[in-house]
Amino acid sequence: MKAQPNAVWNASASVRSTYTQDGGVLLDVEKGMCYSLNAVASKLWNHLEQNQAGVTFDDLVNVIRNNFEVTDGELETDIAAHLEKLERMGLVKRSARPA
């Protein structure tokens, strides 16, 4: 998946979360599924959850860049793959950025 400048990402309203020192856990209450998150995924999820109006791909890249040591190329590839996986699982929704 390539970064889409006109897309915003939102956490699904059916997902509940809790955080630990080294990650977190998501519960999709509609599907009855539980998912564990590492520290990076937990930071991404927390940012999605705290910004109900939605976040852009660049917002997520900046959150991780400011909190973890990682190369930009690797960072963008990993975040894109993570968002794609979350979208397939129905945990996030992608929509067009409001004009």
Task: List each language-model region with its residue ranges.
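Acidic, low-complexity/disordered tracts enriched in E/D and polar residues
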Residues: 1-42
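Long, charge-rich, low-complexity alpha-helical segments
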Residues: 33-99
